[in-house]
Structure formats: C-alpha cells, structure tokens
C-alpha cells in the first residue's frame, strides 16, 4: 500500500525552500549599490578588501535576505492568494519557522554590521529596523504606495551606497556621494512601484494600498517612469555642473535607451513589467556605477 506523503505536514523546512525564502535574486541591487559606494570614495581598498567583501555579504545575503524572510512571513496570507506555491503558504517552511529564520538573520546581520565599525553598524541597524517596519504589523509601511516603495528604494540603493563609502573611508561620506546616492534611491521608488504589479490582486484583497491598486496600472506605470527619469536627469545635470560632462553623456545615453524601453512598458504595464526589469532597470543601475566613477575624488572647495 502506498502512502501519500503530502497528507502529512512537514515539521522542518525543506532545504530548497530556505533558499527561496531569502530570494537570492533580490540581493544584486544592494550589493551593486554597496560597490558603487566603495567606488565613489576614490580610495583603493588595499588592506580593506576583507571589509569590502564582508560588506557585500552583509548588504546582500544577510540584510536583504533577512528582509525577504521577514516579508515572506508577514505576507504569508497575501501570498496564499497571489503565489500559493511560495515556501510558507505551500507548507514547505512549516509553522513559525519563517519567523525564527528572520529573527536569527536579524541577529546575525547586526553582529556582522558591528564588525564594520560605527558607520557600518549604524547603517545596519537602520536597515534592519526599516526591513521590519516595512512588513510587520502594526507599522507595515508596505500598506502605503508612497512610504513602502520609498523605504525599500532607500534601503536597496541609497543606504548600501552610503555604507560602502563610509566603511571604506572610515568616516562620513562627502556631499557629492550622499547627494547622488539619494537621487538614485529616489529614482528607485519607480522601480519598486513596478515591482508591486505582480501582487496586484492580493494587495486589493488585503488592503495594501500600492500605487497600482490606488492609481491603476497605467497611471502607476507612468508615475514610476517619470520618477526614474527625473532622478537621472538631476544626476546628469549635477555631473555637468561638477565638471564631469563625459560621465553625464554616458548616463544620458543610458536614459535615452530607457525611454525607448518605457514606451514598450507603457503599452502593457502589467504584462511588460518583468521584461522592463530585465532591460530598463539594468540600464538604470549601469548608470549608477558611471556616476560613482564620476564623483571619485570630488571635493567641496573652501
């Protein structure tokens, strides 16, 4: 007689589901932003290469992975509607294991952040608090289509950039670094808005007021494209003012290519979002590194 093992719920997580829980595909943006921060300082790492590598691990697998675990746990009811095959609603990570994993990774993130010095630790504390504030009740900032994507954009692009610069320079980043990092974080609000399209139906049912829910897919997509373009136009303008016309020209070319991709996106926002994430967003983050090289060595004159 055969036994249907699916009738018996798991007591421990499925190993593959653990990797799905922390979503490695999401680690690239903060790692890339962290590297942009290290480049923008204009200092050769030298003996600090271990700090650079440790910061990459912290920004990606640890803090970003922890935020994904926390979000998956807090979103398990929404995911049961949107994506029932995800690790927690499918039962592959049973009981409260998702919560325990998120808490363990929180502690581990803080411990590693402590090793990066006061600036690295401070940024880690901010990132950890932001991750929980985004997902957990009663705060749950992701319910807002404005605050939620804004917080994620700041933690995915601005905070890692700031951290990479601060860790390598062992001090507060310059005005130029902070300004460019904040502008790219502002533009990333549009990227995060596009990311909300995949959860449109579940967000409607569970009261998550994402911009696609509040404004409709067409208007939300236009707003996202406007925000992304505005941020890059401001960066281009500043680079010209700061005497970096070649770098400004490269970012302009990348923006023009994005505008063509945006035209395709706006024809079918919900259907073309995955495509745009692989094309337009890639061009956006390439511009980040160009800007990082542009501001290397810039100093405020007395």
From Swiss-Prot:
Pathway named in the protein's UniProt entry: Porphyrin-containing compound metabolism; bacteriochlorophyll biosynthesis (light-independent)
Transmembrane residue ranges: 25-45, 49-69, 97-117, 119-139, 145-165, 166-186, 223-243, 246-266, 275-295
Membrane association type: Multi-pass membrane protein
Record keywords, A-Z: Bacteriochlorophyll biosynthesis, Cell membrane, Chlorophyll biosynthesis, Membrane, Photosynthesis, Transmembrane, Transmembrane helix
One biological process term in Gene Ontology: light-independent bacteriochlorophyll biosynthetic process
Top-rank taxon, per record: Bacteria
Keyword Cell membrane assigned: yes
CDD domains on file: PT_UbiA_chlorophyll (cd13958)
Stored InterPro entries: Chl_synth, Prenyltransferase_related, UbiA_prenyltransferase, UbiA_sf
Entry keyword annotation includes Transmembrane helix: yes
Gene3D superfamilies: UbiA prenyltransferase
A GO term from the CC aspect: plasma membrane
Short name of any one Pfam family annotated for the protein: UbiA
Main location: membrane
Subcellular location(s) per record: Cell membrane
GO-annotated molecular function: transferase activity, transferring alkyl or aryl (other than methyl) groups
Function recorded in the entry: Catalyzes the esterification of bacteriochlorophyllide a by geranylgeraniol-PPi.
UniProt name for this protein: Bacteriochlorophyll synthase 33 kDa chain
Organism (species): Cereibacter sphaeroides (strain ATCC 17023 / DSM 158 / JCM 6121 / CCUG 31486 / LMG 2827 / NBRC 12203 / NCIMB 8253 / ATH 2.4.1.) (Rhodobacter sphaeroides)
Lineage: Bacteria, Pseudomonadati, Pseudomonadota, Alphaproteobacteria, Rhodobacterales
């Amino acid at each position: 007689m055969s036994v249907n093992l699916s009738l018996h719920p798991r007591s421990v997580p499925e190993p593959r589901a653990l990797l799905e829980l922390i979503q490695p595909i999401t680690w690239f943006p903060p790692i890339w932003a962290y590297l942009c921060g290290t480049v923008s300082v204009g200092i050769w790492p030298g003996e600090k290469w271990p700090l650079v590598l440790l910061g990459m691990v912290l920004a990606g697998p640890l803090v970003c992975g922890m935020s994904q675990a926390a979000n998956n746990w807090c979103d398990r009811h929404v995911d049961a509607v949107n994506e029932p095959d995800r690790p927690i609603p499918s039962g592959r990570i049973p009981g409260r294991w998702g919560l325990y994993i998120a808490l363990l990774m929180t502690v581990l993130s803080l411990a590693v952040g402590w090793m990066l010095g006061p600036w690295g630790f401070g940024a880690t504390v901010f990132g950890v608090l932001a991750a929980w504030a985004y997902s957990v009740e009663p705060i749950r900032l992701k319910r807002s289509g404005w605050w939620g994507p804004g917080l994620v954009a700041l933690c995915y692009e601005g905070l890692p950039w700031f951290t990479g610069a601060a860790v390598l320079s062992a001090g507060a980043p310059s005005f130029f670094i902070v300004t460019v990092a904040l502008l790219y974080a502002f533009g990333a609000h549009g990227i995060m808005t596009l990311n909300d399209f995949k959860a449109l139906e579940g967000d409607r049912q569970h009261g998550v007021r994402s911009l696609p829910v509040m404004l409709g897919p067409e208007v939300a997509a236009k707003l996202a494209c406007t925000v992304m373009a505005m941020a890059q136009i401001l960066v281009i303008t500043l680079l010209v003012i700061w005497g970096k016309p070649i770098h400004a020209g490269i970012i302009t070319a990348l923006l023009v290519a994005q505008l063509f991709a945006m035209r395709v996106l706006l024809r079918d926002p919900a259907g073309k979002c995955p495509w745009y994430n692989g094309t337009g967003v890639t061009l956006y983050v390439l511009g980040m590194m160009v800007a990082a090289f542009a501001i290397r060595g810039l100093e405020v004159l007395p």
